Amino acid sequence: MIKKRLDSRTVRRVLPVAALLAVCMAYASMRGAPALMAAVATRELPVYNVDTEEKVLAISFDAAWGRANTEELMNILDRYDVKTTFFLVGFWAEKYPDLVQELVSRGHEIGNHSATHPHMAQLSAAQIREELRKCSDLVKSITGKPTTLFRPPYGEYNDTVVKVSREEGYECVQWNVDSLDWKNLGTESMVKQCTQSVNPGDIVLFHNDSKYILEALPRILEYYTQAGYKIIPVSQLLLQGETWIDHAGQQHLCTPTPAPQPEGAAAPTA
C-alpha cells in the first residue's frame, strides 16, 4: 500500500558531510535531527530524489515549447494507468489551455516551471517571485487549483531561487534520472538512460515534445512495471513530516534519536 506523502514540513538545508560528522560527535547526547541541523552551516538545495524503501518512483514532464506528442503521451499514460507531474511554463499554459485542462481531467499533477523560462539563478529575489506568481496565476485561472511544486528552468538554481520558491509555498524539485531526451539520441538511448539504474524514490525527467518520447515511454513504463515499481506523482513521492535534504539532494525523514534508557530498564519490545 502506498503511503500518502503530502504537506511535508522540510528542513530545507543540505548538510556538508564532514560538518555533519563533527556535529554528530559533539552532540551525541542530544536528541533529534533538527537540533543537529540547526547547528550546521548549510546551503539551500531542491529535492532530487527521496529516501524510501517502498518501490515507488515519480515520472515528470517539462512543457515549455510545443504541444507535439502531448495528447498521445496522455493516452500512453492512461493505458498503463500512470499519473505523473507536468511542470508547465506560464506562456505554454496560456497558449494551450485545452491541454492543461485535459491533463488535470486525466488525473495528472501540474507544477510551476516559471512564467517565461528564464535563467532563474541570474534573477533577483523580486524577479524570481514574479516568475513564480505569474505562472501560478495563469495555471490557476485555467485549472482552478494552485501549484505547490516548482522546477527551475534548465535545472539552474542558487540559494536565492530555492529560498524564494519555498517562501512562496513551493517545494523545489529537480530529478535524479535524466532521460536526456532533449539530445535526440534515439529511442534506445532514452530507454537505457531510464532503466540502467532504477531505485526507490527516483524522480525521472522527460520533456513532452521530445523526438523519441512516444517510442521510448511505453518500453520504460513496461520495465518499471515488471520490476515491481508503482509510479506516482511527485507530490505523493515527497515524504510527510519533518524532513531534511542531504548533500546529494535526497530527501530524508528526520528520525529522532531514541531517549536514553534509565540504568537497568528493560529494553523496549516491538
Identify the residue ranges that each predicted region occupies.
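Active-site beta->alpha N-cap acidic-glycine motif
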Residues: A35-L123, Q127, E131, S136-S141, ...
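Terminal accessory/targeting
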Residues: M1-I59, N75-T85, P200-A270
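Catalytic domains of cell-wall/extracellular-matrix polysaccharide-remodeling enzymes
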Residues: E72, E94, P118-T255
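Sparse, context-dependent recognition of short Cys/His-centered cofactor- or disulfide-binding micro-motifs
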Residues: L15, L21, G32, T42-P46, ...
